[in-house]
Amino acid sequence: CNEAAGLLDLATASQIDKVAEEFVFAGPFFVLNMANGNPIIVDTNTLQMEEGAHNQPAAILNSVDRWATHRSGSNIEVPDDLRQKIRDRLLGILFSLSFDIIDRGIGTPSDLNFGCQVALGFRKGPLDIMRDIGEEEVNRIMATFEKDRPGFPQPTKSFSDYQAFHRYVLSDEVDNTRVITLRRPQAMNALNDEVTEEILDIMQNDQNNPDIKGFVITGYGTQAFSAGADIGKFPEMLGDKTASVQYARDCANVQVYMDTMAKPVVAALNGLAMGGGLEVAIRCHSLVAVKNATLQFPEIGLGILPGIGGCVVPYRKWPQGAALFNDMIMLGKPIKTQDAADIGMVDQLVDTPADLIAAAMAELDRIRNDIPRIAEQRVDIPEFDIPDKPMAGKQEL
């Protein structure tokens, strides 16, 4: 916000906010109006002057009560050359502070990226913005910023060093167990290609680590283990059998790897598990869950089926639940974890999320020397009875 105020000799508050909206949901002056933030910026930047005069608050912040700006999304004209100057300055201060936070150990790259999105309203984390525009453009912006605003921190490491981290998955060692936490709460911990690649990377790195006896996979927060897979790629593959089959294989890399692992993996369901998220969970060697969690394969509502194991694995692992699985897959029927426990699908239920990881680690110890594997023999699946008049809501099909 202070840097935005320093641009008022070049542009209006509304123009600056409009340029900022490429990266944030609300521009700096709009936010200052909402929070009565001018005195806050003056006080905080005055304190920061202990680190250098470059942090001095813009004088205009002491002279204005409210800013003449627009609501986010309004059509505001900004000439291209002016847009570039504003953009460079705003990204310059963002990148400078991001490098400084990482270099001084104030926060991890993952926490920085995550916090900017969930707490500060960024569309993408600053390190994702850097990745999108590329190393050459980041270097150009930082060189320009150093010339315009000397004194602010510059990067001390290579571009690749700042990009080498897991964006969506937390990895913690707890009593010789690797706890993997899916952290995309803004998307209900939905899976995408990067999430599955990060899970696989952690597992592969620790598979031969003698200090790690097994893995627990859980979700961040209490709302969802994982609400499924991002479906953004699905439309472009509709009707293309070859591309669809290959994408299903690619999405199943984690599951296929777990099938052959010598160390056990326990899914700790902290909340909703749907679609691709449930397919990851059922491929783990055991499941524990909170009592109020819901499991569902909603794919049929999109005109597709669970394509990375959901149509096969449940029947092979828990044949006694075949009739229930028919309803889940063909009708999209949600079930509670108590229903899953009744058929042996969930091995242990706990009352609260606080008890979940301890239960998962106990379950890991229980199966450690005899990891359950997916049966390969033929299983009997009861016939699915199609209703006489299939309905989609009130619409007869």
Task: Please place each PLM-identified region on the residue numbering.
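Glycine-rich phosphate-binding loop at the start of an alpha helix
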Residues: 228, 245, 252, 275, ...
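A structural preference for short, pocket-lining loop segments at secondary-structure junctions
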Residues: 175-183, 193-242, 252-270, 290-294
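N-terminal glycine-rich phosphate-binding loop for ADP-containing cofactors
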Residues: 1-176, 183-186, 194, 234-241, ...
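CoA-thioester-processing core
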Residues: 274-328, 359-361
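Structural motif
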Residues: 19, 268-269, 298
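Glycine-rich beta-to-alpha transition loops that act as phosphate-gripper elements at the mouths
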Residues: 268-274, 328-334
